[in-house]
């Protein structure tokens, strides 16, 4: 099996198989019936088709730890997955049962949707067919024009199956989930056209989430690579994935990704719209953008980054910046505003856009197109002017029943980070904050996963709900498979550190389980409990490869004579004992003190 996510809302150390969970068919054992390693299990909900996946880590002391899992069916040995078929539509019956949506023909797929001219042959797909060959489907939308969003249901007092699902994942009551969504403090991205997802929630009362970016460009990558990167990212713990493709076959790539993704998929519709006008920002129109949004909503995109806060009056505020406008979406909209000397069409048509998103339950991710791209530009007038507009737009979106989160910076030194979260929470009425890092210094190309991981841990501790990962390739190139893993693991560390600092239920039990395994030299348990078991085992075996080293009471760093934990254990054995023995020893020393005349200091004998 491939290692899956290891964050936990309900990290439990129990004997045997936990109550309420069922193992998959591939549960490993030691030959004597005792489970070892880890396996995919499920927690049963209130209905037969509501089974929440968990990762069960079986310890060598007979206990187990239950961890949050994002890997989907790919790590369930009992499920036969095939990317050409796609995943099973987990939520389909829930959506149909609500009775407020309908199937319809949808818009036809056009050559320009894939960045192709009418006369161009379809090609460049390398190893995958041009059209997704899985089960045929028609798009679904609201039946009567009313919002079919989780926000609308929550406001009506309904606890949907999706809400129950995430409540089990987060180890909280379902009513807590409903209340947070209804108040706009959390979002549950779940397009009615993406029934394959395992529902998750983004909000500061819940586990800090991590997003991984994938996507092709005009110079590199293929559909097959992007599908592989998506499944790879989720197996290492990505809670959502954004497809930021800007090259050929954008529509087709997205279809393959959506049909195979167990997590919500986000996009930036502006990128595809720009491809439809051959990269000329000034030729963009509201009609082209609107059509692109509907195209993506029909496919099943769960959340969309919309740069509606980049307004004409704010563009001059960036003139004195060291690095100007670094957001792709922000620069596109700034160029359009200047070319036409008009207010942004995204801002002008925002209410109409709300109506479209509410029809499919697409969540807004209001983009920070004027985010700082260098430490020198952090927290400037342009950044905060846009933030105030995002606060206004958040209010409008909620009025239309659209779930909304707010995107944040960027490059921010540590002493300026807290101001960002404080202002966002105040201006945006505690809507979930979704930040890229922030990067805390500009001097480390090739190590920006570290510079940003520092800022990510800090801002998540103070309330950011989701972190957008940064890979070692940031500012340098398109990330490959290894870069994706490094980015996800780095940000999972930041997210879990924040969960610990916030006191999230169950967070520390995972750390305690690993600490116990470390102190007791249970090496296999340490590996299996680690965020990255494969690398932990690999590093250990580089210097102590022999199998007996897996049970040795030392590692290669200190060796057998200088291992601090072994010395601590020896002290316990030699000088420890029961409470009664300790108290008897203290009493004996008290008698010796009295017999010596109750003197604190005794003369040194010659």
UniProtKB/Swiss-Prot annotation:
GO BP terms: namely: thiamine biosynthetic process; thiamine diphosphate biosynthetic process
| Polar residues bias locations | 1-13
Where is Zn(2+) annotated to bind? 411, 475
Segment forming the signal sequence: none
Note one Pfam family from the annotation: ThiC-associated
Single Gene Ontology MF annotation: carbon-carbon lyase activity
Instruction: Return the annotated region ranges for Disordered.
Output: 1-49, 105-147
Q: Which residues bind substrate?
A: 213, 242, 271, 307, 327-329, 368-371, 407, 434
List of residues binding [4Fe-4S] cluster: 555, 558, 563
Per the record, the pathway is: Cofactor biosynthesis; thiamine diphosphate biosynthesis
Q: Which InterPro entries match?
A: ThiC (IPR037509), ThiC-associated_dom (IPR025747), ThiC/Bza_core_dom (IPR038521), ThiC/BzaA/B (IPR002817)
Cite the EC number.
4.1.99.17
- What keywords are annotated for this sequence in UniProt? 4Fe-4S, Iron, Iron-sulfur, Lyase, Metal-binding, S-adenosyl-L-methionine, Thiamine biosynthesis, Zinc
Q: How is the cofactor bound?
A: Binds 1 [4Fe-4S] cluster per subunit. The cluster is coordinated with 3 cysteines and an exchangeable S-adenosyl-L-methionine.
Q: Which residues fall in a compositionally biased region of kind Basic and acidic residues?
A: 105-117
Q: Which cofactor does it need?
A: [4Fe-4S] cluster
Q: What does it catalyze?
A: 5-amino-1-(5-phospho-beta-D-ribosyl)imidazole + S-adenosyl-L-methionine = 4-amino-2-methyl-5-(phosphooxymethyl)pyrimidine + CO + 5'-deoxyadenosine + formate + L-methionine + 3 H(+)
Major enzyme class: lyase
Q: What GO cellular component is one of the record's annotations?
A: cytosol
Stretches of Low complexity bias are at 14-31
Coiled coil spans:
none
Task: Give the family, as the similarity comment puts it.
Answer: Belongs to the ThiC family.
Cite the PANTHER family for this sequence.
Answer: PHOSPHOMETHYLPYRIMIDINE SYNTHASE, CHLOROPLASTIC, THIAMINE BIOSYNTHESIS PROTEIN THIC
Physiological role: Catalyzes the synthesis of the hydroxymethylpyrimidine phosphate (HMP-P) moiety of thiamine from aminoimidazole ribotide (AIR) in a radical S-adenosyl-L-methionine (SAM)-dependent reaction.
Identify this protein by name: Phosphomethylpyrimidine synthase
């Amino acid at each position: 099996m491939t290692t899956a996510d290891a964050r936990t809302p309900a990290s439990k150390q129990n004997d045997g198989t936990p109550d309420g969970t069922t193992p998959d068919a591939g549960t490993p054992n030691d030959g004597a019936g005792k489970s070892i390693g880890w396996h995919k299990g499920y927690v049963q909900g209130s209905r037969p088709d509501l089974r929440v996946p968990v990762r069960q880590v079986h310890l060598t002391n007979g206990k187990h730890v239950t961890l949050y899992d994002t890997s989907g069916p790919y790590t369930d040995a009992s499920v036969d997955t095939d990317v050409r078929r796609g995943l099973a539509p987990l939520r389909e019956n829930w959506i149909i049962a609500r009775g407020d949506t309908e199937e319809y023909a949808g818009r036809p797929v056009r050559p320009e949707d894939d960045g192709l001219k009418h006369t161009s042959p379809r090609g460049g797909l390398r190893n995958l067919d041009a059209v997704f060959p899985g089960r045929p489907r028609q798009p679904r939308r609201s039946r009567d024009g009313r919002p079919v969003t989780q926000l609308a249901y929550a406001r009506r007092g309904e606890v949907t199956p999706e809400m129950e699902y995430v409540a089990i994942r987060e180890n909280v009551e379902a009513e807590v989930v409903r209340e947070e969504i209804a108040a706009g403090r959390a979002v549950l991205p779940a397009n009615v056209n993406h029934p394959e997802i395992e529902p998750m929630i983004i909000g500061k009362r819940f586990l800090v989430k991590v997003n991984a970016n994938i996507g092709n460009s005009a110079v590199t990558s293929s559909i097959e690579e992007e599908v592989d990167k998506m499944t790879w990212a989720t197996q290492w713990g990505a809670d959502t994935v954004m497809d930021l493709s800007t090259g050929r076959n954008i529509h087709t790539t997205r279809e393959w990704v959506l049909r195979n993704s167990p997590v919500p998929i986000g996009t930036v519709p502006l990128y595809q719209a720009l491809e439809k006008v051959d990269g000329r920002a000034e030729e963009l129109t509201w009609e082209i953008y609107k059509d692109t949004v509907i195209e993506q909503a029909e496919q099943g995109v769960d959340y969309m980054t919309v740069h509606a806060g980049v307004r004409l009056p704010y563009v001059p505020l960036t003139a004195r910046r060291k690095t100007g406008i670094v957001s792709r979406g922000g620069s596109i909209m700034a160029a359009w505003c200047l070319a036409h000397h008009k207010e942004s069409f995204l801002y002008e048509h925002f209410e109409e856009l709300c109506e479209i998103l509410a029809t499919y339950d697409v969540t807004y991710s209001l983009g920070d197109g004027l985010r700082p791209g260098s430490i020198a530009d952090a927290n400037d007038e342009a950044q905060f002017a846009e933030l105030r507009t995002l606060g206004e737009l958040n209010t409008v979106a909620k009025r239309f029943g659209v779930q909304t989160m707010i995107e944040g910076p960027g490059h921010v030194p540590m002493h300026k980070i807290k101001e960002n979260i404080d202002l966002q929470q105040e201006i945006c009425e505690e809507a979930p904050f979704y930040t890229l890092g922030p990067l805390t210094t500009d001097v480390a190309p090739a190590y920006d996963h570290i510079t940003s991981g520092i800022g990510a841990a800090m801002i998540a501790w103070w309330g950011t709900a989701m972190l957008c990962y940064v890979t070692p390739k940031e500012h340098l190139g398109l990330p490959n498979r290894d870069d994706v893993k490094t980015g996800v693991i780095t940000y999972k560390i930041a997210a879990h550190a924040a969960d610990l600092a916030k006191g999230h239920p169950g967070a520390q039990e995972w750390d305690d389980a690993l600490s116990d395994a470390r102190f007791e030299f249970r090496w296999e348990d340490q590996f299996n409990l680690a965020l990255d078991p494969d690398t932990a085992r690999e590093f250990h075996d580089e210097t102590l490869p022999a199998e007996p080293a897996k049970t040795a009471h030392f590692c290669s760093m200190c060796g057998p004579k200088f291992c601090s934990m072994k010395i601590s254990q020896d002290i316990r054995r030699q000088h420890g004992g029961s409470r009664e023995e300790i108290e008897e020893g203290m009493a004996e020393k008290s008698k010796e003190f009295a017999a010596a005349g109750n003197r604190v200091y005794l003369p040194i004998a010659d």
